[in-house]
């Protein structure tokens, strides 16, 4: 199965994106979710270093805690930054990923996140926001 065939993509309407962003901001501000940032990814081994999560975070936020910077930047996303919603068909029980694009220092940054809000009374572990991509485009 190639990469494209295992993904289902769609564009959400403005109301859905606004609702998603409101819930994302609430989750971040409440402190009830963890931020899991994929700083090192296998796909980055084949990429120009400039387009990796590690490089982008170090370049944009050199003197900041990465998690705190991500919390702030995710909270600042707007409906205008939204690109698409993606479902990885290999993992049907995982929530959809949202893709955003935002400009920093005159360069586009590709942001892909997945929010998993787990009910801890039924599942071991905490709710989390997985930041899969935060890199120059």
Model-derived features with residue positions:
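Basic/aromatic recognition patch in beta-strand/loop cores that engages polyanionic ligands
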Residues: 90-117
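Compact soluble domain cores
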Residues: 2-15, 19-94
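Enriched for short, Lys/Arg-rich terminal
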Residues: 108-109, 115-137
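A generic structural signal for short, non-catalytic loop/turn and secondary-structure boundary residues
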Residues: 72, 93, 104, 124-127
